[in-house]
Regions:
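Catalytic-core regions of core metabolic enzymes
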Residues: 1-653
Length: 653
């Protein structure tokens, strides 16, 4: 691969059993190479890896690709060996790609290196690709002759013992030759650090990720494949969306999106025109546009007037514009130019189905002549021999799409990136860690109050009373009241009827005490204390919660609260590295958010205190690394636009 791809640098094969390999002089050992070595590619039996790496490091080799498999991915013994190798590499200040990888490719003329065991010759492009799976790499390279995929850099990372997605993300962001960054990942090596790169606005280029392991079974398979820690796919979905990272559903989507960013300008909006010579494919394209949340552009009167002068009377000047099968290449070009000139149009999908009497090749070439600042995507559905001729065009050819639905997804991804790419200010830590070392499991009410005071969390005034000593003098609140039974063992008080609300007298308070005590006894739970609170009649009940994900770190949630929270599942989740826009999205993306706007004559709820609570909660879990989860549920929204956190659980580790 190195030789046939045209690498012009020096190559030193090392193998004690050969004198020459493919015309290159072969050396019996690393030590016998009488030259500096910039890059070492190691493909030796696993038993020889540690020794070979040692020789390379002794020779001051700073970059190593370890292709050999049989490390972390096969179990504990392999994991231990991988760690030993990594330790040596780190101590020497070198970097390692792999192990269990396929190698790397650099297509740019100043390097021109294919250091993989796949002999394909990818064309030079401005897309970088990083894959955790060597088999996916091989599959992608094996399909190059059937696709328009072009690469600048191509990395098979394997187990990511050292070089991982974070390293390459930063490297490619700074590389002016690279325009689009793509990943196939089965795990995130340092997920929280990955997100911080976006939270600090260090990454500006479009990033597209295909994540293997969506289902529980898929996550398990990915873990056994890579030996890496998995995470819930809902968390992956949430964080990628939050930071403007495009998520592909398959390889076709991944590289279609990359082609879009590499070859076309970003759409200014979401209004799309479809031009076709066949009705069916246009309908499929329109369905895909609507599914992706895009709009079918309303063509202006002047545009329709111009189109009527060109299009056959039985064709259509409405969007989608239909030239019928007899539309000639020059006519196709003119129609595309007219529609692109319409101020109501942000992007155009041009679909050409090749009839016997009109050449697809000529139609494509004519449309390629168009100069426009708007994205113009061509779908071509030609006779089979077209693709053979097309692949012989020079490297500057514009990419084509084969399915009428594909451009809709590309436009949707580009519009998503366009909306998310602007600079935003994200939350940072506010305080140093509060000392929670003496706390185990769920925090005590006293410690909860300390946190609440520190972060301005509006917990409703509460009084902790030992069982058996409730009397008129111990209650500082006016009626009505709420009485709760408290125990660290009890997660959901309502499940055992341990909450009594709207208590209007001392007699009702005593009865509530007896009822709660009886409920604890029935359920074999130890009642530690009673909690007395003022009763606030709710207008709405919301939830604000959070947890520390093992991969991506602190997460926060907002949604409908109360005892039916799991049933309604009306929750929006994001990383705790929030921007003000993220907080607005959290509220707006829930059904509760719709209710808070006011429905059926109700007045809208003032959202400023809710936004502040979400922000304070995020800061709390960002600052305090021992907090593993917290749950403010319910948070009562009163009729006079006040909020009260009436039930709190905070767990530490």
């Amino acid at each position: 691969s190195i030789k046939t791809y045209g690498y012009k640098g020096k190559v030193f094969p090392v193998n004690p059993k050969a004198d020459k390999i493919l015309g290159y002089k072969c050396y019996p050992s690393v030590d016998s190479v009488n030259s500096d070595i910039d890059l070492a590619i190691v493909a030796v039996p696993k038993i020889s890896v540690e020794e070979t790496i040692g020789h390379l490091l002794a020779k001051k080799v700073s970059s190593i690709i370890l292709i050999t498999a049989g490390f972390k991915e096969v179990g504990e013994a392999g994991k231990e060996l991988e760690y030993k190798v990594l330790l040596k590499v780190k101590e020497a200040g070198a970097r390692l790609v792999g192990p269990n990888c396929m190698g790397v490719i650099n297509t740019f003329e100043d390097v021109k290196l294919n250091a993989t065991f796949v002999a394909e010759k990818p064309e030079t492009g401005r897309t970088a690709f990083f894959s955790q799976s060597g088999a996916v790499c091989a599959a992608v390279l094996n399909t190059l002759r059937e696709t328009d995929i072009k690469f600048g850099h191509f990395i098979s990372a394997g187990n990511k013992a050292d070089v991982c997605e974070n390293d390459m993300l930063l490297f490619w962001e700074k590389d002016s030759k690279i325009k689009t960054i793509t990943f196939y990942l089965e795990s995130f090596e340092k997920g929280e650090e990955f997100l911080k790169l976006f939270a600090r606005n260090e990454i500006k280029k479009p990033v597209i990720i295909l994540k293997g392991g969506r289902s529980a079974t898929g996550i398990k398979a990915a873990q056994s494949h890579t030996g890496a820690l998995g995470t819930n796919d809902k968390v992956v979905e949430a964080v990628l969306d939050q930071f403007g990272i495009i998520r592909a559903n398959n390889l076709n989507e991944l590289f279609n999106a990359a082609k879009g960013f590499e070859n076309f300008p970003l759409p200014a909006g979401n209004r799309v025109a479809v031009i076709t010579n066949g009705g069916g494919p246009a309908i499929l394209a329109v369905d895909a546009l609507i599914k992706e949340g895009l709009k079918l552009a309303e063509l202006s009167g002047s545009t329709k007037k111009k189109l009527k002068e060109i299009i056959h009377p039985e064709g259509s000047t409405e969007n989608p514009v239909d030239l019928l099968p007899g539309g000639a290449p020059e006519q196709f070009k003119t129609v595309n130019e007219i529609v692109l000139g319409d101020n109501n149009v942000d992007a155009v999908i041009s679909i050409f189905v090749e009839p016997v009497m009109v050449s697809a090749e000529e139609a494509v070439k004519k449309i390629n002549e168009i100069k426009t600042s708007k994205p113009l995507f061509q779908t071509v559905m030609p006779l089979p021999e077209f693709w053979t001729r097309y692949r012989k065009w020079d490297n500057s050819r514009k990419p084509l799409f084969r399915n009428p639905e594909d451009p809709a997804k590309v436009i949707s991804n580009m519009f998503f990136y366009q909306q998310k790419k602007d600079h935003r200010t994200f939350l940072k830590s506010k305080f140093s860690d509060l000392d929670l070392s003496g706390e185990k499991g769920f925090l005590s009410p006293k410690m909860i109050n300390s946190l609440a005071e520190r972060y301005g969390i509006p917990i409703i005034p509460s009084l902790l009373i030992k069982r058996g000593i409730i009397n008129k003098s111990t209650n500082p609140f006016t009626y009505p009241l709420v009485l709760k039974g408290y125990s660290k063992e009890l997660i959901h008080k309502s499940e055992i009827d341990a909450v009594k609300i709207d208590i209007k007298s001392f007699e009702e308070l005593l009865q509530a005490e007896m009822d709660i005590l009886e409920s604890f006894n029935k359920n074999n739970l130890i009642l530690e204390d009673f909690l007395v609170q003022p009763y606030i009649k709710p207008k709405h009940e919301i939830l604000v919660g959070g947890f520390r994900d093992p991969v991506f770190g602190p997460m926060v949630m907002f949604g409908s609260g109360g005892k039916y929270v799991e049933i309604f599942n009306d929750i929006c989740m994001k990383s705790a590295y929030l921007s003000d826009k993220d907080i607005e999205e959290m509220i707006n993306r829930t059904k509760m958010g719709e209710l808070l706007k006011g429905v059926r004559g109700e007045s809208p709820f003032e959202l400023s205190e809710i936004k502040e609570l979400i922000k304070s909660s995020a800061r709390m879990i960002l600052d305090n690394h021992s907090i593993t989860e917290f749950d403010f549920n319910p948070v009562i929204l009163s009729k006079n636009d006040q909020i009260f956190v009436v039930d709190v659980r905070i767990k530490t580790n």
